[in-house]
Structures are given as C-alpha cells and as structure tokens.
Regions:
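Terminal interaction-prone segments of large eukaryotic proteins
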Residues: 1-290
Length: 290
C-alpha cells in the first residue's frame, strides 16, 4: 500500500491511487490506472512467478487493444486473452471462473468491430453520474427529467471546446513551464509531468521550451535531457519495447540539453519507481500515443 500511494500519476489522470485497504471503494478509473500503470511494478515482487506471468497475458493484451497505434498487433492480443482464459482455472481454481472472465475472449472481436478500448470506454462519464442524479426531482419519468435538465444546461453552456484552442501552447508561472502539446497532453518541469518518449524511442526529461515569441506557436521546440541507461522490463509474452515500455535509471541523464520539435514527440510517459534506487519503469500514457 505504501508503494502504491507513493506513485505520482501525471496531471491527466485525475484520481490518485489509494491504499489497497480502500480497494472496495476504488472507482473504475482507479482500477484502470492500476492495471495500465502500476500493476507490473507493484505485483512483480509480490506474486509467484507463474501467477505474475499469467497476469502479464492480460496486461499486454489490454495495453495492445487500448490504442490504434498497436493495431498491427491486435491479433496477438486476442491470442494472449485466449491463453489467459484457458489457464485461468489452473492458476486460480475453477470456482473463480465467471462470465466476466469468459467474456475476455470476445474483447478482440469487439475492438475490431468498434475501435480501441480507449475510444469506446465510458470512464470519462464516471464523474458525471452524480450530476445526472441531481437532475432528478422525483422518481417519476426519470429519463425525461434528465433529458430536459441537460437540454436546459446546454443552452447556457459557454465553455470553450478544444477545437477553439490552438495547440501547442506554452504557459509560464513562476519557475514552472507548462507545454500543452496536444489535447489531453501536458509537459511540465516537475516530477510527474516531465517524461516523454520521442519517435526515435529516446526517453527524455523535459526541461524548457524555446519559443521566439509568445504568439509564435509554430516554432516551439522542446528542450530536455535524454535518459542514457534504459532496457527491457519483460520479454514475455512480448518484449516490453514492442509496447514502448522500458526500465531506466533516472539519475543517468545526458549532460547536455537536446532539442526537438513537437512533431518528434511520440507520447507522454508515466514514471513508476521501483524499490531499487533511482530505477523507474516508463509506461506510455495511453491516450497520448501518436
């Protein structure tokens, strides 16, 4: 639980991971964050090897099916899920087999039909359930009440949409520089928002921007320090580099700054520190992959 609570998820993930003692109260988005970013580190030294390897089938499959960037590997994800379900009763016992476990075998077909898991996920609506509930004044004709209240709110909704905002943009407040790279993707010179992966697979720690003027957004370049020591974190059922996951030493940074354009950035990275000094696992923030 202590290691779990110390994980600093990036700004784009609004819910901080809570202690395992609150597991019964975790929201669906917290479970997703644990699976995508914390699980392979937290479970590594806490599960027997055979159970951990079985879990990795699920982790890799869900990761692959969560982005169209991995579309050429979706078929492998389907195979991993088949193996996960087939071996489930051997690992956990037949009494834990359920329809939810069986339904994993249909995930590949559904993703092929409707799109990546991220594009068909309902996580963004999770926080809106409370607002829907508040639109109801009685138990009579609930749906009509909700529709009427939402329609009324839409008439007064004046907030800007992302389509009205030009990307990238730079904001400086004190010693903190924030680059809004793309919708839902920020780089900031702090602990949890500074790591990103370049398209040539270099891991870089963001330091500063180089911009000719406040309005010259087309000439923004990113400056940062390259991580010199990195390697694979696993090689089964596929190599971690195939899904852009690496381990690295956070104090092995290049001495000189490197500079690149926004177009050279592949994705933001979530840095999850292990129990080894200065070692971190770098995992792509799924929705920022291009």
């Amino acid at each position: 639980s202590e290691q779990l609570e110390k994980i600093q998820l990036p700004t784009e993930i609004h819910r901080k991971l809570r202690s395992i003692k609150y597991l019964h109260y975790w929201k669906a988005s917290e479970c997703a964050s644990f699976l995508h970013y914390a699980s392979i580190v937290i479970l590594k030294d806490r599960l027997p090897t055979d159970i951990y390897n079985h879990f990795m089938l699920l982790f890799c499959a869900v990761t692959l099916l969560s982005s169209t960037i991995y579309k050429d590997k979706w078929q492998f994800a389907g195979q991993f899920l088949d193996r996960f379900v087939q071996d489930f009763d051997k690992v956990y016992g037949e009494r834990y087999m359920s329809s939810n476990v069986h339904n994993l075998q249909h995930m590949f077909d559904e993703v092929q039909r409707f799109g990546s898991l991220s594009s068909i996920s309902t996580y963004p609506f999770e926080n809106q359930l409370q607002h829907l509930k508040r639109t109801l004044r009685s138990g009579f004709r609930n749906l009509e009440q909700a529709i009427n209240r939402i329609s009324e709110c839409d008439e007064f909704h004046l907030s800007k949409s992302n389509s009205q905002i030009k990307f990238p943009t730079v904001a400086v407040k004190g010693n903190t520089t924030t680059v809004h790279v793309r919708p839902g993707f920020q780089l900031r010179n702090n602990l949890r928002d500074s790591w990103f992966l370049a398209k040539d697979e270099k891991i870089v720690k963001f330091h500063e921007t180089n911009q000719c003027s406040e309005h010259d957004i087309d000439k923004i370049t990113i400056q940062g320090y390259e991580l010199c020591v990195k390697g694979l974190i696993f090689n089964d059922p596929i190599e971690s580099s195939e899904i852009f996951i690496f381990k690295g030493c956070t104090n092995s940074l290049s001495e000189s700054l490197m500079e690149m354009s926004i177009e050279q950035i592949k994705c933001k990275l979530v840095a999850v520190h292990t129990n080894r000094k200065h070692e971190a696992i770098f995992i792509p923030l799924i929705h920022t992959l291009v």
